[in-house]
Regions:
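Hydrophobic alpha-helical segments at protein termini of multi-pass membrane proteins
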Residues: 1-198
Length: 198
């Protein structure tokens, strides 16, 4: 399989999503600390709750559910969307409630804002930021010819499989790479709002 070139607009989208994923949480942290007078601890409590509730507990339940009913979920977009939404609501909002009830003190607007920035911010960094770094590294290797040189050292089957896996970087519409950053902005605003409401 021939390795294509990753369009400059796609790389710009990757960089945009990367910058949003890291600059937005850091900017919100600084804003909440300096302008709102929030404590720093709620930010890190938000990060910790995301890690425990989503990356550990929710992920463990997903593994069990997909072993038992993976085919049914994969076969229905609606069922999959409902399942995903319910699981996110259950784990993230339970974690948010526990944090707000027992950990974030005092429970006021500035600290609720700071918690939301931490919870949504670490999610942006880990889900979109890390993927953007990987995409940018792959795009640079492809466009510089390094990837083609690496593929030439593999046997034909492995080279074809690797090129097929990488093909999304040059076949995906460029706007899609911007979408990750836009979606993270929306998600962080949602986390801020939900944290303030709770």
């Amino acid at each position: 399989m021939t390795v294509g070139m990753v369009p400059g607009a796609s790389i710009a989208g990757m960089v945009f999503s990367l910058v949003v994923s890291f600059a937005l949480p850091i900017g919100l942290f600084v804003y909440a600390k300096k302008k709102l007078g929030a404590k720093a601890a709620p930010f890190f409590i938000g990060c910790g709750v995301f890690f425990v509730m989503v990356l550990m507990l929710e992920a463990a339940i997903h593994r069990i559910v997909f072993q038992l009913a993976g085919e049914a979920l994969a076969g229905s977009v609606i069922l999959y969307a409902v399942y995903g939404g319910l699981m996110a609501a259950l784990f993230e909002e339970t974690g948010r409630y526990i944090a707000m009830r027992f950990l974030v003190k005092p429970m006021d607007f500035p600290n609720a804002f700071m918690y939301g920035a931490g919870h949504g911010g670490v999610e942006a960094m880990l889900l979109c930021g890390v993927a953007s770094i990987s995409n940018i590294a792959g795009a640079v290797m492809i466009n510089s010819g390094t990837m083609s040189a690496q593929l030439a050292t593999l046997d034909a089957e492995k080279a074809a499989d690797t090129a097929a896996a990488l093909s999304a970087l040059w076949t995906t519409p460029s706007l899609t790479f911007f979408a990750g950053g836009v979606e993270r902005i929306i998600a962080v605003v949602l986390h801020l709002s939900l944290s303030i409401l709770v």
